[in-house]
Amino acid sequence: KASQKLGIFYNTGEGGLHEDFYQYGKNTIVQVASGRFGVYKDYLEAGECIEIKIGQGAKPGIGGHLPGAKIVGDISKTRMIPVGSDAISPAPHHDIYSIEDLRQLVFSLKEATGYKKPIAVKVAAVHNVAAVASGIARSGADIIVIDGFRGGTGAAPTRIRDNVGIPIELALASVDKRLRDEGIRGNVSLVVGGSIRNSADVVKAIALGADACYIATAALMAMGCHLCRSCHLGKCNWGIATQVPELVKRLDPETGCNRLVNLVTAWTHEIKEMMGGMGINSIEALKGNRLMLRGVGLNSKELEILGIKHAGE
């Protein structure tokens, strides 16, 4: 509902999409992940874009686990799995072990939807992400989505979440440079997230070459999340990550929607103010404009990867 009011997109995640939300199709990105939960033709047709999720910034290289206690009622129906059964997402897609395999899935999804939907591929920000992105750009995908280190999740081991992956800024800059060097940057859009916590992070990402950004944890906090870090227990005190009826009632959808609209609207105003201070009057003029950025506390290699100068230069 907030996406509809703001004119932006929201992502279903890997758990499918309940039919009640089909009315928001013009603002929906449907996701196809390794578990393929809830994926069928009507689901693919329900959104404006299809995202193939290969990796996630908070847990590169591993899958996911939704406890059986959360698989009840509509969740069971939407994911198309039995009530009470654990939902296990494998680490890899078992039909994707090469760029050629990825290309086959990309074009299978395009064909299934009449070549009407753009296809995005989401990967985690890791050390070889530039090479991975180069392959994705050649697979026929329309959008490359990069998820950075410190992105949020309710289903990742602490040691993986806190120690695996690289910051989204370094991943974005290296991917943008690699695609430009190979002359294929114009073939795809770059969308980034993972540690996008405020409007300044959005400005930095666009200046480093992103076409768009997405948020998750910031949106949850706007809706009332208090970062209890107990999503996996299924007993969220704020009614967000739970299926317990008494707890679900604590989340007021209308209030959450209004707060999320306020957040994105405020960020939009702040971005305009920062752009005005730079003498830039359009987001297009900011995209890839590294002249607007300076590094503080970064070493020479990091500055080289980012393609920016140190403060004072």
Model-derived features with residue positions:
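Residue-identity detector for threonine
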Residues: 12, 28, 78, 113, ...
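A generic structural signal for ordered alpha-helices
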Residues: 80-83, 87, 114, 122, ...
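Gly/Ser/Thr/Ala-enriched C-terminal appendages of enzymes
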Residues: 197-200, 206-312
